[in-house]
């Protein structure tokens, strides 16, 4: 084991996780091929850079302090084959549409993080499954094995392919944004794709009209040349599940501090360990044991990180977890991604909020709602789906509970696609079980389609818009008195 440590994580090294118990760890049969693949990853350049990671840390600090809102979304399990122009653009446009709605409703900057350019690994409850009467290894994501039953052998070469597809995806994201895809002067050019619902289209049009009216006014007074109106930042994320992949992409790099002139040769540059595979990584619900490998790995990286918490999370685990992952209590360093289920959130979330917000970690975490994972169910034929009414209900309850607890729900974490899939039941289109087979294309969990995702964005926007009106009315009332 290497001996290098970071100032904020005593006794830590990129490989110190290997001394800890680990869950969801694949056993590669070909150790030589694994070593060859990881050695190649060590020589490849970073996919993301420290200055980008630091910018996200700053944005998430604002979210933790109630000054911004975090929108995170993308595929459940990203496939290598999703590295195509149309597929990437459809997800970018959907995140832009949702963030426009949130910007209008919450009246706060929106931080956008895609579940893309690296979301290739998935935890599984069983290492094997039965297909056509034959037992085969479970599909664990393209970074490990293939979906076709004949491709279920763990293949270390997929680690390098994952790097290549992540790099290509992010390269196109950067190019598309640099070419003006996110220009606020033309939000109708983003299109509503597959949305046909007149009421939803009208509501979106109203939002666009308000934004364009504001831009016309800014143009009149000569204040519309700010580059923030023509571009956005879109950060990448994935579950940091496969540590054999994350370790070789963890690099000791200079902190991008402000440079002085003339250069100060007396003070060596500050260095930190960055995971350069993505801007943001999270620990899943199945791997967040405090004394296990994933928490050990995550405690040493400078990236902002997330932790999934749900019904199986004891309240007593929260503060030890935060003290391990964020000993300096940096606001925005840790995002707590809550995923209880619509029938459990009311009984579990309040205690979790009170535990954190009554401690030394008050106003330091980002509270983010994942209304997807606690609401998965199987219907006839074993098809996995989610009811939009359950997803909507959990998000709605979470907003209400945070308001009652005087805490701030700073984000939502969604599995979604810009395609017209039929994977989640209900929503404005009223999808039922018979509709699931129309366009069910997910290789893992069911995703929201464009229409359903926009409905959730309007739910959050309307909540914060109403809250803003209430505060304004209260302010006026007090000023009169």
UniProtKB/Swiss-Prot annotation:
Give EC number(s), comma-separated: 2.5.1.54
| GO BP annotations, alphabetical order | amino acid biosynthetic process; aromatic amino acid family biosynthetic process; chorismate biosynthetic process
Q: Superkingdom, according to UniProt?
A: Eukaryota
State whether keyword Amino-acid biosynthesis applies: yes
**GO molecular function annotations of the record:** 3-deoxy-7-phosphoheptulonate synthase activity
Q: In which pathway does it act?
A: Metabolic intermediate biosynthesis; chorismate biosynthesis; chorismate from D-erythrose 4-phosphate and phosphoenolpyruvate: step 1/7
First-tier enzyme category under EC: transferase
Q: Which UniProt keywords apply?
A: Amino-acid biosynthesis, Aromatic amino acid biosynthesis, Transferase
| PTM characteristics | The N-terminus is blocked.
Chain positions covered by the region annotation Disordered: 1-22
Catalyses: D-erythrose 4-phosphate + phosphoenolpyruvate + H2O = 7-phospho-2-dehydro-3-deoxy-D-arabino-heptonate + phosphate
Keyword Amino-acid biosynthesis appears in the UniProt entry: yes
Stored Pfam families: DAHP_synth_2
UniProt lists the family membership as follows:
Belongs to the class-II DAHP synthase family.
PANTHER family, from UniProt? PHOSPHO-2-DEHYDRO-3-DEOXYHEPTONATE ALDOLASE, PHOSPHO-2-DEHYDRO-3-DEOXYHEPTONATE ALDOLASE 1, 2
What is the protein's quaternary organization? Homodimer.
Protein name per its UniProtKB record: Phospho-2-dehydro-3-deoxyheptonate aldolase
Q: Which organism is it from?
A: Neurospora crassa (strain ATCC 24698 / 74-OR23-1A / CBS 708.71 / DSM 1257 / FGSC 987)
- What does UniProt list as this organism's lineage? Eukaryota, Fungi, Dikarya, Ascomycota, Pezizomycotina
